[in-house]
Amino acid sequence: MKALKPVLLALVALQRVFAQTPVDLEKLQQQLGHDEKMLSDWPNLGRYRAENAKLAMPGPGEKRVVFMGDSITDAWGRSGGKFFPGMPYVNRGISGQTTPQMLLRFRPDVIDLKPKAVVILAGTNDIAGNTGPMTLEQIEGNLTSMAELARANKIKVVLSSVMPVCDYIRPQTERRPPAKIVALNGWIEEYARAHKLVYLDYYSAMLDDQKMLKKELTGDGLHPNDAGYAVMEPLAEQAIAKALKGK
């Protein structure tokens, strides 16, 4: 009983603190709910399970393309309800995700959908440490694994550069140092060249003269706004066309 007394006193003290600060308690409850969901389905396999089940297999001659990524992919076309209108493109982005999470869901969210090509945009959240510290080598290994899985299933691969960030609106470069983004992009480009994959360079097209994401292309210094997606869309189309031609 004596051993339990300090624990009980601490719990009483915490209860008093939470009673005095209900907003903090609410945030804690939300965080616990988020953590519970993460622990029960860390790669978020459930996000697209129902949609995948409803999606019919590609028809004859259909050149389905899956976009695998994080929030930048997830938000693409969501505001206007249009994601490459008229094209058989499937959005499988999940906000906040890192490459190990994407690798775990690569089979149900890409391979099982029988696409002709996959566009992979990933790495910024790994650099930020969203799911824990990650070295560049670990990120590269996960990207390599996704590319190899795709090729083993006769899926053409488009590897995208990590997007630049900026501090013009909110501080973003502390968690995502530009030097790390440049280093990872250098590896992605070289890997794509060495393995005859298509490299999709969003980075260069969205960079200003300060080596930052152009202010007019973002609302928070990290995610593209409508103007940003307008820059990205034709680049993605060109890369997909190149991949499907096998060049």
Feature-to-residue mapping (PLM):
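N-terminal secretory targeting modules
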Residues: 1-66, 73-74, 78, 83, ...
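Short, flexible loop segments at the rims of nucleotide/cofactor-binding pockets, characterized by
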Residues: 41-46, 94-98, 177
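Conserved beta-strand elements of the Class I
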Residues: 66-68, 90
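Short hydrophobic segments within beta-strands
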Residues: 68-69, 160
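Short active-site-proximal "capping" loops at secondary-structure junctions
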Residues: 72-73, 97
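Alpha-helical cap/lid subdomain in secreted, periplasmic
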Residues: 81-88, 97, 101-247
